[in-house]
Amino acid sequence: MAAAVLSGPTTGSPAGAPGGPGGLSAAGSGPRLRLLLLESVSGLLQPRTGSHVAPVHPPIQWAPYLPGLMCLLRLHGTAGGAQNLSALGALVNLSNAHLSSIKTRFEGLCLLSLLVGESPTELFQQHCVSWLRSIQQVLQSQDSPPTMELAVAILRDLLRYASQLPTLFRDISTNHLPGLLTSLLGLRPQCEQSALEGMKACVTYFPRACGFLKGKLASFFLSRLDSLNPQLQQLACECYSRLPSLGAGFSQGLKHTENWEQELHSLLTSLHSLLGSLFEETETAPVQSEGPGVEMLLSPSEDDNTHVLLQLWQRFSGLARCLGLMLSSEFGAPVSVPVQEILDLICRILGISSKNINLLGDGPLRLLLLPSLHLEALDLLSALILACGGRLLRFGALISRLLPQVLNTWSTGRDALAPGQERPYSTIRTKVYAILELWVQVCGASAGMLQGGASGEALLTHLLSDISPPADALKLCSTRGSSDGGLQSGKPSAPKKLKLDMGEALAPPSQRKGDRNADSDVCAAALRGLSRTILMCGPLVKEETHRRLHDLVLPLVMSVQQGEVLGSSPYNSSCCRLELYRLLLALLLAPSPRCPPPLSCALKAFSLGQWEDSLEVSSFCSEALVTCSALTHPRVPPLQSSGPACPTPAPVPPPEAPSSFRAPAFHTPGPMPSIGALPSPGPVPSAGPIPTVGSMSSAGSVPSTGPVPSRPGPPATANHLGLAVPGLVSVPPRLLPGSENHRAGSGEDPVLAPSGTPPPSIPPDETFGGRVPRPAFVHYDKEEASDVEISLESDSDDSVVIVPEGLPSLPPPPSGTPPPVAPIGPPTASPPVPAKEDSEELPATPGPLPPPPPPPPPVSGPVTLPPPQLVPEGTPGGGGPTAMEEDLTVININSSDEEEEEEEEEEEEDEDVEEEDFEEEEEDEEEYFEEEEEEEEFEEEFEEEEGELEEEEEEEEEELEEVEDVEFGSAGEVEEGGPPPPTLPPALPPTDSPKVQPEAEPEPGLLLEVEEPGAEDGPGPEIAPTLAPEVLPSQEEVEREGESPTAGPPQELVEEESSAPPTLLEEGTEGGGDKVPPPPETPAQEEMETETEASAPQGKEQDDTAAMLADFIDCPPDDEKPPPATEPDS
């Protein structure tokens, strides 16, 4: 009749039309449909007057279909809602009527099952007690097993819902549960399984109310522990494991926790006793239970020896399951687990092997039972791992030894079978691999699996054996005539061919009976355990293990895809193929640090795996490809390399802009990436012609800033003099002619600039002499790892500074940092730095550093270049023109945040210090003194100083050439041919600058700082004669600083500094003492001049090379140490 109700309306009205007979409106279709369905079922059981559906069959004929009808009604969600209360009430009446009759009891229970699950709360509370009474009557009636089973299922639902309602919970606990348990205990043996189901529901939902019957329940459960029915035995174990929670807080004078622990110890004692009975005289040193537990009183067994062993085995199995369930089941209170005692039992069981069993008498029977006992022990170990988790790590070594021990015990006879047959002991090995996966899943890399040792090697051997597909036993044999099985010796003209001997018992694969999925379970378990271990412990696994896995997995995947191993191998199963791909992905995601992952081969394999017949396998391969693609080709660039290092160029006031430019965001973006080896990017726009001195490719090595002596002369860009600048030495920008400075910058600027855009050119009027000088870049052949680690936010004096072309001469030789996004002026190359601190500022400054000879005082225009904080490294000299371009033009890769913060504060101090330094230099040389005054005036005297700067540049070039020829001849070859930059800032000091290295000079404060270190170190005899005495001390101080940080000789120190810019920073800090960035207002040219004047007399005495090195080293510390250096120098 339900079909008739759901059928369409009669002709004359469209289906579903509101007015059609039988039609359901859209608004009320759901409730009305449910009502019609309920009435339809009621009509099937008993005709009802006024029903929309007329009865067609007697109710009894529908009895066999009622369970299915109840399921269909649940699918429609018939119950619930006020609209259905009337229909549900009718069903309640029908159910009660049918339950009262023996003939219709089953139909009444079917209706009651629907009512209990679908009735609303009010209806359930109203009828729950009456339904419980009806169920109890059914249990006492000793009806047929199907009826009893349905009644117990309804009882379980009733107790589950009633336990959620406090009123019903109290009522049932006090008045009804004792009678229900008594009825369940009295069921006949045929209904024992139903009785155990009902008892399990009672002890689960009403544990306190069951406490008064705890003794009877325990006896009932124990008597069923050795049942031969697996389902009955499992139910008895589950019920017994819940006994400790029965009763109130105190059960028979014991707390729940104490009761649980006592029960656990009793189980352990009983298991030890049973094990001793099973394998008496087979254990060499049996472990006895030392716990406080008392052995359980089990029913006596029969006298027959064979039967006794089987009954003992059943009891042992049941008690072991009870122990595992107690460990894995939830308990209402925290308890203490005797881990050591449980592990002792497990080790005792697993320690019994076939070698210990005497095959006489009952030995074969004991040997037959042994695998089952080992499985019980492994289940117990699994439950213990789940219960205790990572707290078992102290026993990790024991667990790591147990697994390969069990595999060794059950590995005999596995290779003698032909393909297509299940190997023996596969179930035990599957369980071992499942425990391996669980142990690694719980403890991660701390599990220590496959990380060396004899146990790890043994485990790996078993894993590879179970993963490898079996091979048909084909042997090469000689012709029949050969007696020794070797090749027949005969005429050389008639060689004999080897033939395949398949053996007598081995037929061709097409003629053999076999299981195509044989050993698929153990193979899949081994693959899962191995893939989990590699994924969690891959980097800790030995390199040799990774290579062995690569050699096995990659060819196996290819063979599976080509169908070469699918004949009778476990890889016929899609589950094994899926786990094989999962293992391949784990090898990619967690490779060994010394063994590269097989990425290209894996990508090919995953691509082909997408065409697998199994949807599960193909879907996993697609997901693996997505994962690999995200790793190899990220759609979003990594954070460190994303975005330009410098913000868009913006005009900034010359003196104060540097601090703002140094915003952390600027440092974070691009400078770090640029520090790494810099491939020569597109040429950076430069004002002057770019001489082809050194290969731009050398710029890649630029990032590494280490002492030159340690490295072979880098073939990097030529200095301003046209000499190739060795990787260790950089020429001060003031000394470098603008055109040559641009030489390297044009090629490297894009690379150095995070944005990769060439720096915009600055109007000629903003540059010195109306033309844009080009900075010379120092390129290093070798890139140090520490160089890559240099960050924009580092506090080191070693920094790469990119100055816009528009800036006045960029005195800061220390930083030849790549220009940020698009520096305007041609980049200036940092002056050659002494071996010690050379690395700090070597970062090529492709950025538009103002004329590499930044010594000219003109701070005019955006002299400050504040953003990159070139100021601390000589921004005043180089940052004259581009206050607006600070963000893009000046990048201080190694600059420190402290210097940036202190720049503004020290700007005034640096100016004063520069003035003092200039006065001292005036005493040494009148030209330098005039240059100092010009630097103070910067913009006003800028043009006048250009002529002097050009002359000085020529002298400096000559000195630099000599210096490079002496020490850096190899490096000097690169850019000697470079034409001297046409435009030099007027205030550039003469040839001494290479040694003085304007890095400290860029800002007067830096010069002071350099002078302070110099004073500490003492005057350096190596400084060029043109350099002021202050510069010499600073250079020596720099050298001392390089030496002090590194215990090794100065060359070693230089190498260390070049490799690790942070060490350079420290040196700079020591030498400079002040990381305060010199104010952009102070002309970098002034600083450079002062340094050159101070170092000039001493520099003449020193070797030109040594002077250049010392000067370059002094520059970074000078940035940090403002005026104090000058006094010591003097």
Curated annotation (Swiss-Prot):
GO terms for molecular function: chromatin binding; SUMO binding. Expressed in ovary, uterus, muscle and many regions of brain including hypothalamus, cortex, hippocampus and pituitary. Expressed in neurin and glia cells. The modification Phosphoserine is found at residues 13, 478, 482, 761, 1034, 1044. Residues 646-657, 809-834, 845-870, 978-992 have a biased composition (Pro residues). A motif (LXXLL motif 1) lies at residues 33-37. This is Proline-, glutamic acid- and leucine-rich protein 1. The modification N-acetylalanine is found at residue 2. Residues 786-798, 896-967 have a biased composition (Acidic residues). Keywords: Acetylation, Activator, Cytoplasm, Nucleus, Phosphoprotein, Repeat, Repressor, Transcription, Ubl conjugation. A motif (LXXLL motif 4) lies at residues 155-159. A motif (LXXLL motif 3) lies at residues 111-115. It holds the Pfam family RIX1. A motif (LXXLL motif 2) lies at residues 69-73. It comes from the Eukaryota. Residues 2-80, 121-189 are annotated as: Required for modulation of ESR1 transcriptional activity. Coactivator of estrogen receptor-mediated transcription and a corepressor of other nuclear hormone receptors and sequence-specific transcription factors. Plays a role in estrogen receptor (ER) genomic activity when present in the nuclear compartment by activating the ER target genes in a hormonal stimulation dependent manner. Can facilitate ER non-genomic signaling via SRC and PI3K interaction in the cytosol. Plays a role in E2-mediated cell cycle progression by interacting with RB1. May have important functional implications in ER/growth factor cross-talk. A motif (LXXLL motif 11) lies at residues 585-589. It comes from Rattus norvegicus. Transiently sumoylated, preferentially conjugated to SUMO2 or SUMO3. Sumoylation causes nucleolar exclusion of PELP1 and promotes the recruitment of MDN1 to pre-60S particles. Desumoylation by SUMO isopeptidase SENP3 is needed to release both PELP1 and MDN1 from pre-ribosomes. A motif (LXXLL motif 10) lies at residues 580-584. The modification Phosphothreonine is found at residue 757. A motif (LXXLL motif 6) lies at residues 264-268. The Glu-rich region mediates histones interaction. The Leu-Xaa-Xaa-Leu-Leu (LXXLL) motifs are required for the association with nuclear receptor ESR1. The keyword Repeat applies. A motif (LXXLL motif 8) lies at residues 365-369.
